[in-house]
């Protein structure tokens, strides 16, 4: 029994969003150099992602920015006359959670976990599965983040070595390896399965979890009352900081209170994490973060795949600079040809012409930028 049995994790069970959310510029903000540079931003919650993307790429004035564009839709964005594709090396990871709970397969053995990593061609997954919009990962820390160990290299694609390691340990005859994935990652799971079946000479079952069953599966993983039936779960996660990834990524997958830990606690990881959490010296913190990532890599605690890039469809008259962490609009601005400014300018010119040729009166008229975005 755990000494501290209480923990929490964020699971969205349902959402009740207003059709539109409007952010208005705060002209009294202390950091005026940063922004805002827009008068308002309107978030459209009354559209599906597909509807939003269709409006963005086929119209001018309906939708300025669409986030989370699928790599499968990137070519449509590039071909549009109204928008451009903005690509960002984001703090995201795509991996396979390995079920280390005791079972009839030896996934608690490091050699087997290494065999799984050696069996997969990561570049093929990036090229075919993500249309090239991803970066290779060594473990769970991207190369641009603090805590990345410069000496590490991603696991190579080495089917012979993978097969040798698996044969050293042994695999139960007739037992297929079970790979699960939510629907968006079903294609990735199939690519992983093909590589593993070829390299390891074992049967593979791919289980694509439909959206309506995803919440129940997530609760099982987070609550840890039941042992999942899958051996590997293809999963994506993110980090809100580039300084110490183990705080938001490694801990969630391997920490004592990690929501996505699938297996017994790891005393060595807990020790490293406790040391990192207590650091007040920045350089020492980064060093321990590197050690944590190295430990995860050496133990092959997950199937390390890649760091997917964040893709945005952005109106060609919007200057949007993406962040690696979150969706930010503080520095976003629109040029003179943006539909919101062009409309205001044309209205101003018409009003001015009317007043000049009319009977006098106030010279006030609309000016400036509405700068509607999203």
Language model features with spans:
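A local structural motif
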Residues: 33-44, 62, 172-178, 196-214
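Gly/Pro-rich hinge or "lid" segments in bacterial periplasmic/extracellular proteins
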Residues: 1-42, 48-50, 159-160, 164, ...
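A ligand-binding cleft/hinge motif common to bilobed small-molecule-binding domains
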Residues: 67-80, 238-244
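Short helices/loops that flank or line small-molecule/ion binding pockets
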Residues: 50-64, 76-80, 110-111, 190-201, ...
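Detector for C-terminal structural segments
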Residues: 16-20, 25, 89, 94, ...
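Ligand-site clamp/hinge motif
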Residues: 28-76
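Short helix-loop capping/hinge motifs at secondary-structure junctions, enriched
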Residues: 29-32, 102-112
